[in-house]
Amino acid sequence: MHILPIRPKAGRLLISLLCSLLFTLPAHAQEADTAGVKELQGVEVVGRHVTGKLRHDSLGGMSLDLSFLDDMPRIAGNADPIRYTQLLPSVQTNSELDAGLYVQGCDNAHNGVSINGVQLYDIQHILGIFSVFNPSHYSRLQFAGSAFTASAANRLGGFIDMQRPDTLAGRVKGELSVGLISSQGTLHLPLGGKSELILSGRGAYINLLYGRWLKVEESAIRYSFCDANVTWLYRPNAHNTLWLDFYGGNDRMDYQEDGEKYDARLGWGNRMVSMNWEWKRQGLVLRQTAYMTRYGNRFSIERPDFRLRMPSGITDYGYRLSLRRGRWTAGTEWALHSIRPQQPETEGERQTTTLSATRRHSTEGSLWADCKFAVARNVELLGGLRANVYTIRRSAFFSADPVLSLLWTPGYGQFRLTANVKHQYLFRTGLSAVNLPTDFWLPADERLRPQYAYGLSGEYRTDLIPGRLQLSAGLYYKRLYRQTEYIGTPFELIYGDYDYRKNLISGKGKNYGLDLMIEKRTGRITGWMSYSLGRALRRYPGRFSGTFPAGHERIHEFNAVATWKAGRRWSFGATLVWAGGTPFTPPSYFYLQNGNLLSQFGDYNSGRLSTYIRLDVSATCRIKVHGGRESGLNFSVYNANCRHNDLFWRLKFNDGQYYYAPLRPLPKKLPFLPSINYYIKF
C-alpha cells in the first residue's frame, strides 16, 4: 500500500481544489461565470461563457488552447504542452527520464508529432522532462488518439500538431519569462498591415546555479540546451495566406562516472524549415507545403582502454497538398527519407572498428480522400481511403488504408464508432527502454517489412450539465503486426562484430482499454479528471516465452487537472497523477565467474515498478496589469507530495556488496523541485 505524504492542511486544500471540479457549479458562487443576457423580441437568450481551454470535435480529436499553461505548474520553469498532453485520457504518463509518448498502448515511434503538419523526430529536451515546443510561439495543440481521417500521416499511434496563430497581431507584442535554470521569450513584430514576424527563443543555464547538485548518486551531469522558432506570416488579401516556419534546437549532456572512470557525451537536435501557402475562395481551401525536417544525435563514451562513437540521424524532404470543399477533402504527400542508422566506431586495446557511415534512402508517397455525408436523421458517415507507395532500392510496397467513422447525435449526446487500417514505413529502436536520444531510426525494406495495425474505437460524449460539465467514455482495440524489438547489448558495440540487423526481432501485439473523462468547463475553477484502464501486450515467437506486457504499459492511471482563478491577481493550478508501475525484467540470481559478476534474469517484463504518484502545484501572482501589459511571478513545486518514484532497477555495488535496487531521480534530502519565474507580457 502506498501512502501519499501530504500534510493535513495541504491535503484539505488539494481535495477541495480537485473536488470543486464536480461540486462548484451554482452560478451564484462563480463570479467569473456570469451569464450574458440579450433580449430578442421578447425572447431571453442566456449564454454561459466557457472558460475551459479544452475543446472536442465530433471525430474524437481535442484542441488545447495553450494559454491554459499560464496558470499551470512548471517543471524547471517550463509548462510543457507535451507533458500536459499526457494528462489526457488514452495518453500514458511518463516517469521523469522517459522521453516517450504512449497513446492507446502504442510505442513512442508510432506517433506523428508535427509543427503545422510537418513531422518532427525525437522531440525531447532534458531527456524528456519537457519537449522542444516553446508554448508561447503557438496558439493551440491539436490531439487525436488515432487516425480518424485518411489525411492522417502513416503512423500507427496518436497525432499531435502544434499550430500557429490564425490572425495577425496588428501591433508589437510579446512575452518574456526568466527562471533560475532557463529563460524563454516570444516577440510579434508587424511588418506593415499584411505581414508579421514571430520570433521565439529558449536557453538553459542549469549548470551555472545547480552544477554541484546535478548528480545521479555519485555521477556528475552537465547539461545545456537552446532552441529557436521563426515564423513569417503574410496575408496579402482575404484569399491568400503565406508563411515560412523555422525551428532549430540543440541539446548537450556530459555524464562522468567516477567509480567506472568513464566520460559519456551526448548531443542531439532538430532542424525544420517549411514554406506554406493557403488559398481560399467560394468554399474551396487549397493548402500546399514544402518542407525539410532533420534529426541527429552524436553519442560517445571514453574510458582509459577504449573510445566508442555512435552517430545516427534522419532527414526528410517532402511536399504536401490538400484540397477541401464542403464535405470532401483530398490530398497527396510525398517524402524522401535519408537515414543514417547507428554504426558504431570503436578504438581500444582489444580492437579498432570503423564502419562506413552508410545512408539509406527511401521514398514514401500517399494519395487520400475523405467524404462526410448524412445517411439518416442525426446519423453521419465519414469514409476515407489512403493509398500508399513506398520504395527502397529495388523493393516497392503498396498499401490501401481505409477509415470509416459512424457519428450518431441523438438528443442526449454523441456516439462515435471508428474503424481503420494504418501502415508505417519507419522504425525506431536501440538499447534504451526509455526512448533516449541514443535510439535510432530505420527504414522498412525487404527484410524489415512495413508494420501495420487494425484499429477499432468508440466514444460517447454528453453534457451532464449543458455547457458546464461534460462526460466522455471511450473504448479502443488495436492489433499490431511486424513490431520490432532490439535485443542487442552494449558489449557487442565494444567487443563484438556489430550489425544492428542481427539484433532485431519481429513480433506482434494488441492494445485495448477504457478511458473515462469528466471536464468542468465554466467558472473560476476549471479542469478535468480522467481514468484509463489499458493493456499493451506483445509477443515475439522464438525469443520470449508467451505474451508479455510492453515496457511502457500502465494498467491503471488516474489524472486530475485543475485551475482556480482566485481573483484579479491570483490564480492557482494543480495536477495529480496516480498510476500503476511499468514492467521490468527482474534478476533471478547473481554469481561470480572468473572475477566477473553475472546475472540470470527471470521472465521478460515479469516485474513491475512501484505505483507512480506525483502532485504538482503552482501559484501565479499578477503584479501589474494595465493597458494590455502584464507582469507577475509564478511559483511551482514539482512532486509536492515528496514521493520517491522509481525510474528503473539496476545493479549496484556498495561496501563490497552487490544488490539490485531501484534508481530514483530526486535526492532524498530534496525530493521535490521548486521553481520561480518572473514574466512580462506586453
Residue ranges and their predicted role:
Residues A374-E380, Y477-R479, K502-S588:
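Gram-negative outer-membrane beta-barrel transporters
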Residues E31, I221, H239-G318, T352, ...:
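Flexible loop and strand-edge segments within Gram-negative outer membrane beta-barrel domains
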Residues G296, E345-E347, W408-L456, L475-R501, ...:
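Surface-exposed extracellular loop regions of Gram-negative outer-membrane beta-barrel proteins
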Residues H56-F148, P165:
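Periplasmic N-terminal accessory/gating domains of Gram-negative outer-membrane beta-barrel systems
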Residues R569, W578-N594, R614, C621-F682:
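C-terminal beta-signal and adjacent terminal beta-strands/loops
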Residues N237, T329, E333, S356-L480, ...:
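Structural signature of Gram-negative outer-membrane beta-barrels, strongest in the C-terminal barrel
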Residues I314-S322, S356-W368, R449, P466-W528, ...:
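Outer membrane beta-barrel strand-and-loop segments of large Gram-negative receptors
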Residues I181-G203, E217-R252, R265-R287, R325-W328, ...:
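Transmembrane beta-barrel wall of Gram-negative outer-membrane proteins
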